Amino acid sequence: MMNKTDLRNLTQDEITEYVVGLGQPAFRGRQLMSWLYRPGITQFAEMTDLAKDFRKLLAEHARLSRFEDPILERSSDGCVKFGFGLDDGRMIETVLIPEPDRNTLCVSSQVGCAMNCSFCLTATMGFIRNLQPAEIVNQVCAVDDFLRSQPEEERIGPEKVTNVVFMGMGEPLNNLENLLKALSILTEQRGLDLTNRRITVSTCGIVPKMRLLGENSDANLAISLHAIDDATRSKLMPINERYPLDELLAACRDFPMPKRKRIMFEYILLKGINDSEAAARELARKLRDIPCKINLLPYNESPGIPYQSTPMRQILAFQKILMDANYSVFIRNSRGTDISAACGQLAKKEEANQQNPTP
């Protein structure tokens, strides 16, 4: 089975190329793509408008991967954390954040992470491997299946995923090739048909790859900033040693995007570390010429991580300074904390400390 081509790893262009390689006309590629992500389709025999001989050929040479029997943890606030088993026995986590008008899915792009951010529980896993495009896309497919299976009276939001944020396990830009393929499938009309404005890719600042993302995708960009001076940021995020703040912010100014779009800067507030009024004023100064909005994140404390949350009154004071400087500033409502599903809390315990080299 494993030597068969997993069609969910392929973009529309690659599907067409694959079909032609099987001796079929190119239009079969469009037909096939329109079936791969339909609800409930698990076998080629179910693709009823494809020629019978073509379906048989596909069954011999290809497969449709999917996640089955996820481990579910439900939060008291409605969030659901999914644990998905991969073919090699590894596990990844994905979080559904439902609201009445939308379902946001926080997806993973790697097993573990090499960035070693000192406030993030995923860092304790080390980097294990990149996810394939199918392993990224199948997180969305599996949660769509879950939502459709729920009685209407039990659903908080719509019956499918409407928004995708790459803020789960891993640094998305360190898996750029597979990320771009996954984004193509997610936004393909014959694929999952999401709009780019509802997809956000968050990075800790892999500067050389930021422009490549902007040139090859219209997804929204979020920057995990978390400090506004190099000494503090390098302590929190070792990647800052390689790409210091001035270089990162220059890349943000140079990021290709439509005039109406803005970069989202994410800023975790850590008690006594980066939450002073002086830090807020410096943040306002440094972001002055970048089209942006700012998302303030109350820190979600985790066992073994030596940081504390900033009191809400201080977060509000920090926000006011930024708003007085004419920034759009939001305070993220932490959800899923009771099941370790909030920002920075995703990590499979059995994977912890299995360190591999940086990809």
Region spans (language model):
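Generic beta-strand structural signal
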Residues: 80, 92, 103-107, 115, ...
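Auxiliary Fe-S-binding modules of radical SAM enzymes
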Residues: 1-92, 98, 151-152, 253-262, ...
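Short linear Ser/Thr-Pro motifs
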Residues: 75, 108-109, 202, 224, ...
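Residue-level structural signal for beta-strand termini and adjacent loop
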Residues: 96-97, 178
